Amino acid sequence: SWIEVDTSNLRGNSSRSMVAFNNKLYISTIDEALGGNTPLLYASEDPEFYRFTEIFPEGIKLEKGKNPTGGITNMAVFNNRLYACVSKDSGIEVWRTNSSKVQANDWTLVANNGFGDLANVSVLAVGVYKNHLYVSATKKLSSALILPQGFDLIRINKNDRWQLVAGGKAYIPAKTVNGSRGESISGFK
């Protein structure tokens, strides 16, 4: 049977991702009314018995460059770290915790600017396979329905270097950290 858990203290109106990490359940939410520009991330040791606590509570001073900069739409555990994917109009970002402890002001930017294509604004799926974290990078869904544009598949290694696995030339080229956009390693465009 199902058990309802108390989520009354969670801000936002849409849950995008859940992951278990170091004996806690993490959930990210998006506040669609605010445009999803605030990282809303919560943790609980056991939501049946303990309320979720906010990782980035209102009022905390978030240091620039040390925290996700928008709504977290996908998460994965990789290399004993929590990775958070941020979908935003200025291009996808991927962040990771600096240790196995998840806390504010202790994150590293792994990728930005949509992996070198500012048209990549959404992360729809992430997964770990053979020592790499794979991330799907998609264009704005409304325009992709009118003019099919495909998606990019990226892989990130344990040193946070990323490579284009499948995808073509950038629609809106941009510089990025920890990798550079070139030919896909699979040859698929």
Give the role of each language-model region.
Residues 1-16, 20, 24, 30-73, ...:
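Trp- and S/T/G-rich repeat-edge/linker motifs of beta-rich repeat architectures
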